[in-house]
């Protein structure tokens, strides 16, 4: 019985920690980590090099024309 109660308490604590991070912030972190477009400012992750946003994905930036390929 003690084990079940402990498990329920631990589950509730983990769930509350997961809910502490807003969904949009979590998505922004995820997009930034994989090099996609950051939803808030529509820019690519700076570490991905010269790239620009096209929808939700980053594409190579044409240096000469300054627009997405």
From Swiss-Prot:
Residue stretch(es) of the prosequence: 21-34
Secreted keyword on record: yes
Principal localisation: secreted
GO CC annotation terms, alphabetical: extracellular region
Keyword annotations: Amidation, Disulfide bond, Knottin, Neurotoxin, Secreted, Signal, Toxin
GO MF entries: toxin activity
Subcellular localization: Secreted
Disulfide bonds: 37-53, 44-58, 52-68
Pfam families assigned: Toxin_7
N-terminal signal peptide: 1-20
Expression (tissue specificity): Expressed by the venom gland.
The UniProt record lists the keyword RNA-binding: no
Function: Insect active toxin causing rapid but reversible paralysis in crickets. No activity shown in mammals. Does not show effect on mammalian voltage-gated calcium channels.
Domain commentary: The presence of a 'disulfide through disulfide knot' structurally defines this protein as a knottin.
Record-stated family: Belongs to the neurotoxin 01 (U2-agtx) family.
The protein's name in its UniProt record: U2-agatoxin-Ao1z
